[in-house]
From Swiss-Prot:
It comes from Arabidopsis thaliana. The gene is ERF095. PANTHER family: DNA-BINDING DOMAIN, ETHYLENE-RESPONSIVE TRANSCRIPTION FACTOR ERF095. It is found in: Nucleus. This is Ethylene-responsive transcription factor ERF095. The keyword Metal-binding does not apply. SMART domains: AP2. Interacts with MED25. GO terms for biological process: ethylene-activated signaling pathway. One of its GO terms (molecular function) is transcription cis-regulatory region binding.
């Protein structure tokens, strides 16, 4: 994606990224499966980190049809013979740990604000996932 320079600063604008008044950058994406509802991706120290979080979410939702801030980082998906979504995302973020991360390889997303329905949905998903894991272990 071409980055657009702001009118009054030398900062670049990225798709899905807004600068907060206190200097941090917020990333969000619209989910077409939920009638264009905003999905909060987190708050980041740099615009580039926020843009990469947007790219990961966009690629996860839309695949090769996604309009990305850093399409060259996902080029492997188009060129590679049998690349997968995970391989493309991992290669695109080599040396990059967006939003923090633990030693177990799972990404941690910092939520600045959640409305009650989204929070309840996330909590229900976590409970269902844990119950499924327990049921699988007992079989």
């Amino acid at each position: 994606m071409e980055r657009i320079e702001s009118y009054n600063t030398n900062e670049m604008k990225y798709r899905g990224v807004r600068k907060r008044p206190w200097g941090k950058y917020a990333a969000e994406i619209r989910d077409s499966a939920r009638h264009g509802a905003r999905v909060w991706l987190g708050t980041f120290n740099t615009a580039e980190d926020a843009a990469r979080a947007y790219d990961r979410a966009a690629f996860g939702m839309r695949g090769q049809r996604a309009i990305l801030n850093f399409p060259h980082e996902y080029q492997m998906m188009k060129d590679g013979p049998n690349g997968s979504h995970e391989n493309a995302v991992a290669s695109s973020s080599s040396g990059y740990r967006g939003g923090g991360g633990g030693d177990d390889g799972r990404e941690v997303i910092e939520f600045e604000y959640l409305d009650d329905s989204l929070l309840e949905e996330l909590l229900d998903y976590g409970e269902r996932s844990n119950q499924d894991n327990c049921n699988d272990a007992n079989r």
